[in-house]
Amino acid sequence: MSKIIGAVEIGTSKAKALVGEVTENGSLSIVGMASRPNEGMRKGEIVDFRKAADAVHASLEEAEKMSGTTVDSVYLAQTGTHLRGEMLSGSASVSSSENRVSASDLTRAAKEAKHKEHEEGRSYVHHIRTPILLDGNPVEDPVGMFGKKIDLSYWSVDGDNQAIRQALHVITNYAGLDVADLILSSIASSTMMAGPDLRRAGTLVIDLGAGVTDLSLYRQGFVAYTGVIPVGGDHLTGDLSMGLRVLEPYAEKLKIEHGKASPDASDADEVVWIIGNKTIGDRSIPRKAISDVIHVRIVELFEIISKELGALLDPDELKGGILLTGGGSKLPGIENVASKVLGMPVRKAAFAPGIDPQLATPENATVLGLLHYGLEDHGRPIGDKDDEPTPGFFGKLAGMVGIS
């Protein structure tokens, strides 16, 4: 029997909803998808609840209409500069007199790693496990093996309760749905755009959104870092509006139709016309001026990323290179600027074969990744046997942030 599941991304520029059907063998088909402009967000966080909620509700309704079905719960993306990550570690001595590892030994090490108290007003969103060590050697599953000590770590991300509550409230109270899980936008998009082989080789995925840029870095197949940079495509629009003295709608049009990450020789002689109105009239702008403004902000963004990651930007550890996705990755030449600033090979991420070409666009990486994340082995795969919905992690989170 197939199972219907949903995904929602409350993005800075658009709210997106997706409906998927999971078959008994675990395959996923996208049966409905819709998006609506979202004027209730700024830098990945809700600033006008009603506008954000209306955009989500409209996109969900349209996606359900397209699919011919309804959803009861959704996977919800979470981003924003309020999110913070750190590596938490724990260890446990093997309790058996024979030094044979048991499941309880592993549980004790995990509890120690997760024991750290978060600050008041904050809650953990993700605990993402990194390699397990048995007597200092990495192992996939130590249970049943012989050794003396288990060490493990989690990349743990916490967030501001108020920001989390707002996002949950849009789904649970306004849309009347359950949240199956809250997933970092960076993890969702990297799950979609960087397959297991790339993650094992080591890769950095940079998701260039409208309000923020999400980062996820993998080493040896495991998450080693996630982060959110408060710079996105809207900043380019704002820069063009101020620098060229045009209204933001015109600036957005200039960015999309004529923008480049860096100017080239041909731009010096090319002129772009803005068809104005009775107030401003028509105007001509050198294309080089557009590229110059964009270039400054793009360089600044990648310089911030370079400073943020520091020693983590190690070519020997990131043999899979750096991938760009998100709507901002469509900017011509952006991979070349990124490579020059970061000092590593950078390319635009490509979707795996089999994704509907109409859906396989960079700006859809996160919402598609929400469902594909659940299909991978992250403790509770989508379409698994009909277990009772897990109240554990998410139930505790909802309780802590005041959602019943």
Predicted regions and their residues:
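Core structural elements
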Residues: Q78-T81, A210, G326-G327
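Acidic-glycine-rich active-site phosphate/pyrophosphate-binding loop
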Residues: S29-I30, D207-V212, S216, E335-F351
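Conserved phosphate-binding/catalytic loops in two-lobed NTP-binding clefts
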Residues: A103-S104, V341-L368
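Glycine-rich phosphate-binding loops at beta-strand->alpha-helix junctions
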Residues: G159-D160, K260-S262, E317-V341
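Hydrophobic alpha-helical bundle architecture
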Residues: K307-G327, V341, R347-P353
